[in-house]
Amino acid sequence: SLIGHNNKLLLNLINDVIDLSKIESGYLELRPDWVNLSELLDESVAEYAHQVPSGVELLTNYPAHDSLVELDSLRIKQILSNFLSNALKNTTTGHVEVFYEVDHQSVRIGVKDTGRGIPQNMLEKIFERFEKLDSFAQGAGLGLSICKLIVEKMNGRVLVDSQLGIGTTFVIELPCRSMLVE
């Protein structure tokens, strides 16, 4: 229903403002724990399975062996949720792919789509508060800004690569401890 949809938008805005306030005031707590990264990402993918547009495939691409990583799973899911939501809104054909790579000291988690892409002159601006590619797009334009701040708090970085009409890839690189699941 329209009321339920608007309630969800308002709740998301309130949560974004609260997160932004916590980050700016230094009160955002990270709670790293050992998690199976494949399982964590699969949970996020499952939450978006019902939002995949017709003509779009939601894919995963993980290493052959699962990895345990020491990360804040709640914040990773928050970041991935933002990336997935944006990718699914901007992809009408093709696919959206969630992937990760792990080495001994870091992890790279990303979302790649075959959507409309982002103009080169907007790539730096998309991480600014209240910045949206379209004035008619839903949301307050805080999601990517919050993601970047959280990743920086984790001593990581956000990378974006995009070409108009071809697609966009968002990747977070984070230092972390990891081990293979036997």
What function would you assign to each model-found segment?
Residues 5-10:
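Short alpha-helical segment of the dimerization/phosphotransfer core of two-component systems
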Residues 31-36, 53-67:
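Conserved catalytic submotifs in the C-terminal HATPase_c
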Residues 31-46, 77:
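A conserved beta-strand-to-alpha-helix junction within the catalytic ATP-binding
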